[in-house]
Amino acid sequence: MLFDVFQQYPTAMPVLATVGGLIIGSFLNVVIWRYPIMLRQQMAEFHGEMSSAQSKISLALPRSHCPHCQQTIRIRDNIPLFSWLMLKGRCRDCQAKISKRYPLVELLTALAFLLASLVWPESGWGLAVMILSAWLIAASVIDLDHQWLPDVFTQGVLWTGLIAAWAQQSPLTLQDAVTGVLVGFITFYSLRWIAGIVLRKEALGMGDVLLFAALGGWVGALSLPNVALIASCCGLIYAVITKRGSTTLPFGPCLSLGGIATLYLQALF
């Protein structure tokens, strides 16, 4: 089968994973930019604030274009990472700067896929971790931009983990994965409720609760404290570096780092 080919050619999997990561990262950039716009349009349409004559945006249409000059991006200018480097981070037509976030998301996804292929070679679990990485990267960037974790991403994390356990590709049994989800939800929801009473404000978003619960289906109930500890440390470091102080902190990226770090710690130790 396919894994037999990877055994015969051991470098094939890392190379394929890296290239696939660049391509998926390019698609994630589209999702990160367009999905919040799509939801705002749906809300405007629901409230009657958007006419049928106004153009709607989707993940497929319109084609990728420069947000400054509206020129459609040529195929040769849409190669993940390399096009940004060749164009020196500027639009070919209007010379407007292209955000560094685009190549960073592509590079981060490629590195995440590469690392998973090296730690879990010839494994369905390695593929599952790649999918998890894609969900978490998209969710984290959207949370950084909008301080909001869309349900579609937290549900993606949840169901990918449960399906991997059901297919016996996960280190966890399906029962352990479900237990991890339930423990994660009860723990963080209780913490959210208590913090709301004590602080008299929302200390944890519901998206954070759902993401923590979903990660429980990947790491198991016993490793959830590790996720919370790493996430809290990351949040503290982020707050100090950005000097956010008492302002709202997007906790989704911290939970994502905590979940991924815990998975690799479980594999390596």
Curated annotation (Swiss-Prot):
Q: Which Gene3D superfamilies match?
A: 1.20.120.1220
Q: Per UniProt, what is one GO molecular function of this protein?
A: aspartic-type endopeptidase activity
**Highest rank taxon of the organism:** Bacteria
Annotated compartments: Cell inner membrane
Any GO BP: signal peptide processing
Q: Which segments does the topology annotation call Periplasmic?
A: 1-14, 122-124, 200-218, 268-269
Record topological domains on the Cytoplasmic side: 38-101, 143-176, 242-247
User: Which cysteine pairs are joined by S-S bonds?
Assistant: none
A GO cellular component annotated for this chain's UniProt record is: plasma membrane
Q: Which UniProt keywords apply?
A: Cell inner membrane, Cell membrane, Membrane, Transmembrane, Transmembrane helix
Role noted for this protein: A pre-pilin peptidase involved in a type II secretion system (T2SS, formerly general secretion pathway, GSP) for the export of folded proteins across the outer membrane.
> Which additional comment does the entry carry?
In many other E.coli strains this gene is part of a type II secretion system, but in MG1655 the locus is missing a number of genes.
Q: What is this protein called?
A: Prepilin peptidase PppA
Name the source organism. Escherichia coli (strain K12)
Q: What is the lineage of its organism?
A: Bacteria, Pseudomonadati, Pseudomonadota, Gammaproteobacteria, Enterobacterales
